A protein has these predicted regions:
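As written
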Residues: 60, 89-97
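Acidic catalytic/metal-coordinating carboxylates
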Residues: 33-36, 59-62
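C-terminal output helix
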Residues: 101-112, 122-126
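Conserved sequence signature across two-component system core domains
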Residues: 6-7, 31, 49
Length: 138
């Protein structure tokens, strides 16, 4: 799975990237602001974005809403030590993970997203097969 990380603290972003790699996933980029997260998402189209809530130029929830406005299928997990619950709930993020983040919790979240991606891909393949057969029969 291809993952984009957005955290304004470089050391946290690097640590998070190392944890994601440890779980056998690919890092497409590590950026330091909500604005950079939007730009990087548009460029890389990752399978998942792990995004800090508190960042300069645009907080994580606002960046999340911006990404989802352009790509409703985007999968974004907010990561934060503390964030206003109203803002995070309305962000569209699929999950909110508390900092400090432990490897077990991160791995479980990554596995959930990877399984969701597999199920979605299988459903698309099945639907394509049904449509193809219907066209051949029709």
């Amino acid at each position: 799975m291809r993952v984009l990380i957005a955290d304004d603290q470089r050391s946290v972003g690097t640590s998070l990237a190392d944890m994601v790699r440890c779980c056998k996933h690919e890092i497409v980029g590590v950026v330091g602001s909500g604005l950079e997260a939007i730009q990087a998402y548009n460029h890389y189209r990752p399978d998942l974005v792990l995004m800090d809530y508190w960042m300069p130029k645009l907080n994580g929830a606002t960046a999340c809403r911006n990404i989802l406005a352009k790509d409703p299928s985007a999968r974004i997990i907010l990561v934060s030590g503390w964030a206003p619950s109203d803002d995070t709930r309305g962000s569209g993020a699929i999950a909110i993970l508390p900092k400090p983040l432990d490897l077990d919790r991160l791995e479980a979240a990554l596995n959930d997203v990877a399984e969701s991606l597999r199920a979605s891909a299988e459903a698309t393949i099945s639907l394509t097969s049904i449509v193809s057969r219907a066209g051949a029969d029709g």
